[in-house]
UniProtKB/Swiss-Prot annotation:
Residues that coordinate or bind heme b b566: 98, 197
Location(s), subcellular: Mitochondrion inner membrane
Chain positions recorded as heme b b562 binding sites: 84, 183
Lineage: superkingdom: Eukaryota
Name of this protein: Cytochrome b
Subunit description: The cytochrome bc1 complex contains 11 subunits: 3 respiratory subunits (MT-CYB, CYC1 and UQCRFS1), 2 core proteins (UQCRC1 and UQCRC2) and 6 low-molecular weight proteins (UQCRH/QCR6, UQCRB/QCR7, UQCRQ/QCR8, UQCR10/QCR9, UQCR11/QCR10 and a cleavage product of UQCRFS1). This cytochrome bc1 complex then forms a dimer.
Gene3D superfamilies xref list: Cytochrome Bc1 Complex, Chain C
MF terms (GO), sorted A to Z: metal ion binding; ubiquinol-cytochrome-c reductase activity
Organism of provenance: Pygoscelis papua (Gentoo penguin)
CDD domains per record: cytochrome_b_C, Cytochrome_b_N
Name of a matching Pfam family: Cytochrom_B_C
Cellular component terms per the entry's GO annotation: mitochondrial inner membrane; respiratory chain complex III
Organism ancestry: Eukaryota, Metazoa, Chordata, Craniata, Vertebrata
Entry keyword Manganese: no
Amino acid sequence: MAPNLRKSHPLLKMINKSLIDLPTPPNISAWWNFGSLLGICLITQILTGLLLAMHYTADTTLAFSSIAHTCRNVQYGWLIRNLHANGASFFFICIYFHIGRGLYYGSYLYKETWNTGIILLLTLMATAFVGYVLPWGQMSFWGATVITNLFSAIPYVGQTLVEWAWGGFSVDNPTLTRFFALHFLLPFMITGLTLIHLTFLHESGSNNPLGIVANSDKIPFHPYYSTKDILGFALMLLPLTTLALFSPNLLGDPENFTPANPLVTPPHIKPEWYFLFAYAILRSIPNKLGGVLALAASVLILFLSPLLHKSKQRTMAFRPLSQLLFWTLVANLLILTWIGSQPVEHPFIIIGQLASTTYFIILLILFPITSALENKMLNF
């Protein structure tokens, strides 16, 4: 009998082990779809980004008009741009759901997979930030100025670091050029990290909603989950195309329709919606260095999740108190997102400070305490 090429060919064998014959728990829910959706987001962003880069000019005098040219004169340029801009939003929606799933179902106990995932999140955030600067509108320019300026809060080397990042004494042509180079490079770095992420995941196999070992009754990935993933793709690409075609500027900032002007500051400088929660935490501390540290901690705190897991059960499926706390955390993040979009005035300042404090208290203190309490309740 001839050998099955799918199982014997060096390259096809790898694909087979990852996408076809991969043993998968039989009970993983739709919350497990977001990993593959992130893969589709990445592919979409790289393809649309590549097409946009072919028509983009990384120069302060030409960047804004080169994008206007892409939208007006390039075949379907408007569609490519709208898909790329809104694709970023969907990328973040998927990654936040993916992380939320990981927290809820205790997936962070696969430490290597979790840690590479956080590094992926940080790289994605960096990519989105440098990408937002490229259209060289008002919010692009001032967003770049405000966020890069935060590095100056680092003692002793801060100012040098900022001027080194800028390539001068303000955000100018060298900054735009290097941001374009970084925005082109980072997605490929994300692709590499994704492969590492998957390698670690396939070492242990997938977690499942019950948080128990499912080795005894695993099923092949194809056709069961390949079909389920394709349904997921359709359900994500439909709202993405709807948004890109019917309301492409819904999530953008109107300020960005004005070319960058270093002499005019916009009344409210704010990032894209997916960074607002972190921006609110940054603003809630009246000290520059303190704000920067809180901003970094808001994401880096995820590294502590495996260490703060005190429960005897892996998932929150049978832990009602932890569930309540988890959804309180979600509500809290939505409040932070709202606060980040508001001006710095009463009552938003105090709400932001309370929500920021609550965010850290829930993750660092209340989750471990609640887990310990639930462990006690198991004995009754």
